[in-house]
């Protein structure tokens, strides 16, 4: 079962940040990218904008299973915070795409001039390191509870 205190801290962290590292792969081909994101805590999802012709997008269209990180850039080890995640990503269309685009453009107004597609990354698993709570402190969240 997910610890409610962990979930609150993870959600707060994801709301405060705005850049993720996204890693996609298919077979022996792998690629990473940095993307701006908007967090939807009700769906435990991240919305991001990236063109379909990029290497990472082409891989995501073949294999929607992705992993990545969201991290602060702290110079002090005692303040390091960051998330490792695993999820499934899909290209949005229709009403879902319009709603996500509206949220994304509110957060990043410069995106209003872009026609790049929006993607929804449904988080499946999160491990957060939060040294502010004690060196090496780990918080966990999982969409699917273990059997």
Swiss-Prot record:
Name listed for the protein in its UniProt record: UPF0306 protein YPK_3704
Family under the similarity heading: Belongs to the UPF0306 family.
Matching InterPro entries: Split_barrel_FMN-bd (IPR012349), UPF0306 (IPR011194)
NCBIfam families: PRK03467.1 (NF002900)
SUPFAM superfamilies: FMN-binding split barrel
């Amino acid at each position: 079962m997910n610890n409610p205190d962990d979930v609150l801290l993870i959600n707060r962290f994801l709301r405060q940040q705005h850049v993720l590292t996204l890693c996609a792969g298919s077979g022996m081909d792998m690629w990473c990218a940095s993307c701006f994101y908007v967090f939807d805590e009700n769906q435990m999802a991240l919305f991001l904008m990236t063109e379909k012709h990029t290497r990472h997008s082409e891989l995501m269209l073949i294999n929607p299973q992705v992993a990545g990180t969201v991290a602060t850039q702290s110079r002090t080890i005692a303040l390091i915070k960051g998330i490792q995640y695993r999820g499934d990503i899909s290209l949005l269309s229709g009403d879902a795409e319009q709603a996500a685009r509206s949220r994304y453009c509110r957060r990043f107004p410069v995106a209003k001039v872009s026609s790049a597609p929006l993607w929804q990354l449904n988080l499946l698993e999160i491990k957060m390191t939060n040294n502010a709570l004690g060196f090496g402190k780990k918080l966990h969240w999982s969409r699917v509870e273990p059997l």
